[in-house]
Regions:
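Conserved NAD(P)H cofactor-binding loop of Rossmann-fold oxidoreductase domains
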Residues: 79-84
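Substrate-binding pocket helix/loop in short-chain dehydrogenase/reductase
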Residues: 87-88, 95-97
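N-terminal Rossmann NAD(P)H-binding glycine-rich loop of SDR-like oxidoreductase domains
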Residues: 15, 23
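Residue(s) in the substrate-gating loop at a strand-loop-helix junction
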Residues: 131
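Active-site helix of classical SDR
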Residues: 111, 147-150
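SDR active-site lid
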Residues: 164-233
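The beta1-alpha1 cofactor-binding region of Rossmann-like NAD(H)/NADP(H)-dependent oxidoreductases
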Residues: 50-61, 93
């Protein structure tokens, strides 16, 4: 019962990048943090549970383990994810499925596991990490953009399902962030000649933007502050720059929006 008066929080993908920084920020704010990832990279004051979010049984087992010890789960932050880049024509179906299995269905697995307990306790907060790429449809990053768009649509609908039970669902749209995500991305420039060099140019632009992106520690603190809110919004966009970009993508005529994206990444 150590966590009776502290928030009990799960962070997926907590071994690196945004997940790790978020877990650290939550710990520093006084939360009891459980980190789900396949790799155990110890962090003081944070409990690691070896969980592959694509393994539904492993997720369910880990959540039950937390409930047995803490009796509640206050919040979940779904950070686990990775990216693939390359032309759709040259991306295998297995690669595309792997992208969705982690980014989308991994999030679904974790949320399904915690929802019965949150519904029973009459409160909870699910935070799903999306991306500005969900609304700015980036060529040669098609499956990543699609997986994040799926997260956003799913989150809006889920909010309507669970709001009557005191459960909040929040989407956090992120832009370019300087983490190991760039190095971890599965990159392919297959077909670059057929596409007139556009694949390599687009991938290079993405990598440049990420290497000059926001500090992940700032993002971790930003997400930790959302967890503290009593009445969180359904959508937050990190930084004024990306808030403006996200808004533009949502209000501009589709033809204008796509022309801008094509000019930058096409």
């Amino acid at each position: 019962m150590a966590g009776k008066y502290k928030k009990i929080v799960i962070v997926t993908g907590g071994s690196s990048g945004i997940g790790r920084c978020t877990a650290s920020a939550l710990r520093d704010s006084g939360c009891i943090v459980y980190e789900f990832s396949r790799r155990n990279i110890p962090m003081e004051g944070i409990t690691h549970l070896s969980v592959d979010v694509t393994d539904e049984n492993a997720v369910n087992s880990a959540v039950k383990q937390i409930i047995q010890k803490e009796t509640k789960i206050d919040a979940v932050i779904n950070c686990a994810g990775f990216g693939i880049s390359g032309a759709v024509e040259f991306t295998s179906t297995d690669q595309a499925k792997a992208q969705f299995n982690v980014n989308f269905f991994g999030t679904v697995n974790v949320n399904k596991a915690v929802l019965p307990f949150m519904r029973h306790q009459g409160n909870g907060h699910i935070i799903n990490i999306s991306s500005v790429a969900a609304v700015a449809h980036i060529p040669f990053q098609t499956f990543y953009s699609a997986s994040k768009a799926a997260i956003s649509s799913y989150s809006y609908a889920l909010e309507n399902e669970v709001k009557p039970y005191g459960i909040h669902v929040t989407i956090v749209e992120l832009g370019d962030i300087y983490t190991g995500f760039t190095q971890m991305r599965q990159k392919s420039i297959l077909g670059d000649d057929e596409y007139g060099g556009r694949i390599s140019r687009s991938v290079s632009q993405m990598e440049h933007d990420e290497q000059n992106g926001m500090n992940p520690e700032v993002i971790g603190k930003y997400i930790a502050n959302i967890v503290k809110k009593k009445k969180p919004a359904i959508v937050y966009v990190a930084s004024a720059k990306y808030k403006f970009l996200s808004l533009l993508c949502k209000i501009l005529p589709a033809a204008v929006r796509e022309k801008i994206v094509e000019k930058v990444y096409g």
